[in-house]
Amino acid sequence: MVSSWRVQQAAQDIRAGAVIAYPTEAVWGLGCDPWDEEAVYRLLAIKSRPVEKGLILIADNIRQFDFLFEDFPQLWLDRMASTWPGPNTWLVPHQNLLPEWITGIHETVALRVTDHPTVRELCALVGPLISTSANPAGRPAARSRLRVEQYFRGQIDGVLGGSLGGRRNPSVIRDIATGQVMRAG
């Protein structure tokens, strides 16, 4: 279990523009403040990930995404609520409410309410976070803190310790309108 003090320090660092690594349900993640354009572009550069691909936003509860849901059908809200918190990512229309550095070239944005206790505590303090697997493009996702440090030594601002959530696969990604699985979990 990670101490609350360490989570609070990570939250403070993120608010100051840091890119950090942290454990998630299945693999280590990299994250930053989604509203900090400079931090997001730095994260993309660290991973060698094109901005056009878009990024996932994670939160500790569905209310952190309410600003996106104003005109959503009840069916969509029910779909998300029935799978969260948990390893389910939904592609939802962003309605031009999010910047391109989050959405890439897509009409949708990927959202997930995490059930990892450390990451939930972090999101409760800072709000939604960018979350992407901790690996350079084309390399396997980090499953240990050691691998994170090997991949990103000197490039990221910190590592929030802790254990992975025990899942073997990343979250399933589904389209909210159709329910179609875009990536198996």
Swiss-Prot record:
Pfam families: Sua5_yciO_yrdC
Role: Required for the formation of a threonylcarbamoyl group on adenosine at position 37 (t(6)A37) in tRNAs that read codons beginning with adenine. Catalyzes the conversion of L-threonine, HCO(3)(-)/CO(2) and ATP to give threonylcarbamoyl-AMP (TC-AMP) as the acyladenylate intermediate, with the release of diphosphate.
Keyword rRNA processing: no
Gene Ontology terms, MF aspect: ATP binding; double-stranded RNA binding; L-threonylcarbamoyladenylate synthase; tRNA binding
Reaction(s) catalysed by this chain's protein: L-threonine + hydrogencarbonate + ATP = L-threonylcarbamoyladenylate + diphosphate + H2O
YrdC-like domain residues: 4-185
Family: Belongs to the SUA5 family. TsaC subfamily.
The EC number(s) this enzyme carries: 2.7.7.87
Transmembrane segments annotated in the record for this chain: none
PANTHER family linked: SUA5, THREONYLCARBAMOYL-AMP SYNTHASE
Disulfide bonding pattern of the chain: none
Entry protein name: Threonylcarbamoyl-AMP synthase
GO-annotated cellular components: cytoplasm
Location within or outside the cell: Cytoplasm
GO biological process, one term: regulation of translational fidelity
Enzyme category, top tier: transferase
Organism, scientific name: Pseudomonas savastanoi pv. phaseolicola (strain 1448A / Race 6)
Main location: cytoplasm
Alphabetical keyword list: ATP-binding, Cytoplasm, Nucleotide-binding, Nucleotidyltransferase, Transferase, tRNA processing
